[in-house]
UniProtKB/Swiss-Prot annotation:
Name the UniProt record assigns to this protein: Crossover junction endodeoxyribonuclease RuvC
Enzyme Commission numbers on file: 3.1.21.10
Organism: Orientia tsutsugamushi (strain Boryong) (Rickettsia tsutsugamushi)
Cofactor(s) for this UniProt protein: Mg(2+)
Pfam families, A to Z: RuvC
Keyword Cell membrane: no
Family according to the record: Belongs to the RuvC family.
Amino acid sequence: MIILGIDPSLVSTGWGVISISDSMVNYIDSGVIKTVSKDSLVLKLGNISLMIEKLITRFNPFHVAMEEVFINKNYSSSVTLIQARGAIMSVIGRYNIDFSEYAPNKIKKAIVGAGKAEKHQVQQMVKLLMHIKKAISKDESDALATAYTASVNQQIKII
């Protein structure tokens, strides 16, 4: 079973692909979708949508998992994050792929064992659990952690 994990952002959306077989988690690939700062919001959202669609057609995931939004004091950044998530979710819906979302503290707890873990701890555990030797960004590790959380969550039934 292939799971695509997504750490949404208008600037740098992290993505990670894992496979689950015989209760083993295997790292397949990961990366970051970067947008151009001078582009309009519409162009940025269009680019994110297009790249997510390319990932879906390339990896054909059984399930997509995404980090939930938490509303912070900076209202405008929260709104743009929600818009990025909407663009991503519309692609997932178009392909009718099984979908789940997880709060950041639930993801941290699944990976590190503590909901208040630091980003570098998540990054280290992702690399350890998935036997990743290369350097990965925090956006990639967050996306892979989200995919991992989906793999251990009981909502996903392996057929």
